[in-house]
Amino acid sequence: VGFKAGVKDYKLTYYTPDYDTKDTDILAAFRVTPQPGVPPEEAGAAVAAESSTGTWTTVWTDGLTSLDRYKGRCYHIEPVAGEENQFIAYVAYPLDLFEEGSVTNMFTSIVGNVFGFKALRALRLEDLRIPPAYLKTFQGPPHGIQVERDKLNKYGRPLLGCTIKPKLGLSAKNYGRAVYECLRGGLDFTKDDENVNSQPFMRWRDRFLFCAEALYKAQAETGEIKGHYLNATAGTCEDMMKRAVFARELGVPIVMHDYLTGGFTANTTLAHYCRDNGLLLHIHRAMHAVIDRQKNHGMHFRVLAKALRMSGGDHIHAGTVVGKLEGERDITLGFVDLLRDDLIEKDRSRGIYFTQDWVSLPGVLPVASGGIHVWHMPALTEIFGDDSVLQFGGGTLGHPWGNAPGAVANRVALEACVQARNEGRDLAREGNEIIREASKWSPELAAACEIWKEIKFEFEAMDTL
């Protein structure tokens, strides 16, 4: 046929509505808002082209490869209900386009270049279907839910955590003291805040030492296994690994990483080290809202959550649901299930666009954290179930009597809710009553109930379908 130079419509090559997707394809659902006058097929094809083999003009070197084998294909387009100029474009990518075991490469391909594309007003990646063939090239979470429970010897209830506040400004010794008080009071974990790295007022090594001392002391006194998420996030991968190695030498059970600001390459490196050395890995999602908060541009958090399960982490922050809207509850539980379960069926009412089979990748514990306190405990226990971590920062340290009583109040509230649930009571309906009953024999809980009885965070949810 010979080479024909010039610009031709993307849809002639990249829009293939009769394509049958393969079991090995990576499938993506994009919410596309084209510029006025750009037809949906062209916009969808442009996304497929620019995120795979295409460029703005035909090139001579196209003839040196098999485009049919390597090109992304826009295979289906559907309008978004209630939106005038918006639709979901489904794109299939051949597996050969991606490096094995690299979340970094997967994202660079699928979302690396196409979001600045002029023909689109906005673009959002709503969901990905990762085929088992690709998942098998990833290690995934270092340990997973069952192994974590066995390491900690804690079963049949959610785990309790607390972020140490004020997050910045404490000396290492005072920080360790707060850790000890919380763990001694009954929490399972305490946590470095995401931006606690190694600052002038508290260098990382001092913090690690005092926190390790605190958790061993609390362990000896309570007879329970305790942990503190030591944040290993650093300016270079080498420094990050140095911190993880020191944590292992101290014999602590868990370290932490900010996976979006730290980057997927660093995160996967750390996850591999954690599995090889028996460390649990707690993941904080700092910066996620920059990417996922806008409804029509960016990436939904469920995609970032899937990427984390591939890259590796044993816990990840996943919102709280409580005090927000019902619609948001279904969507949050959608990606919570994506983190925990082995197989998740397609369910558009929960924002899940594809059936996802995780084959052998362990599950991740969702962490509920942010503005929660003892009155939320029944709802949190009901919504998240046993396989979760409930984290109360201010809800522990803000107790009028101090840190340890704050921890006691949370532990009593949790045990009361779990017992009530196991006895068949309805936490959604009887939650307040259950907390009131428990507070009669726990002065710490009674004081917490009194101080937070009026607090509400009532804003409309951003994350709706």
Swiss-Prot record:
The modification N6,N6,N6-trimethyllysine is found at residue 4. GO terms for molecular function: magnesium ion binding; monooxygenase activity; ribulose-bisphosphate carboxylase activity. Its main location: plastid. Keywords: Calvin cycle, Carbon dioxide fixation, Chloroplast, Disulfide bond, Lyase, Magnesium, Metal-binding, Methylation, Monooxygenase, Oxidoreductase, Photorespiration, Photosynthesis, Plastid. Mg(2+) binds at residues 191, 193-194. PROSITE patterns: RUBISCO_LARGE (PS00157). The active site is at residues 165, 284. One of its GO terms (biological process) is reductive pentose-phosphate cycle. The record marks 324 as: Transition state stabilizer. The modification N6-carboxylysine is found at residue 191. Its cofactor is Mg(2+). Binds 1 Mg(2+) ion per subunit. Substrate binds at residues 113, 163, 167, 285, 317, 369. Its EC number is 4.1.1.39. GO terms for cellular component: chloroplast. CDD domains: RuBisCO_large_I. It catalyses: 2 (2R)-3-phosphoglycerate + 2 H(+) = D-ribulose 1,5-bisphosphate + CO2 + H2O; D-ribulose 1,5-bisphosphate + O2 = 2-phosphoglycolate + (2R)-3-phosphoglycerate + 2 H(+). It is found in: Plastid, Chloroplast. HAMAP family: RuBisCO_L_type1. Heterohexadecamer of 8 large chains and 8 small chains; disulfide-linked. The disulfide link is formed within the large subunit homodimers. The basic functional RuBisCO is composed of a large chain homodimer in a 'head-to-tail' conformation. In form I RuBisCO this homodimer is arranged in a barrel-like tetramer with the small subunits forming a tetrameric 'cap' on each end of the 'barrel'. Belongs to the RuBisCO large chain family. Type I subfamily. This is Ribulose bisphosphate carboxylase large chain. The gene is rbcL.
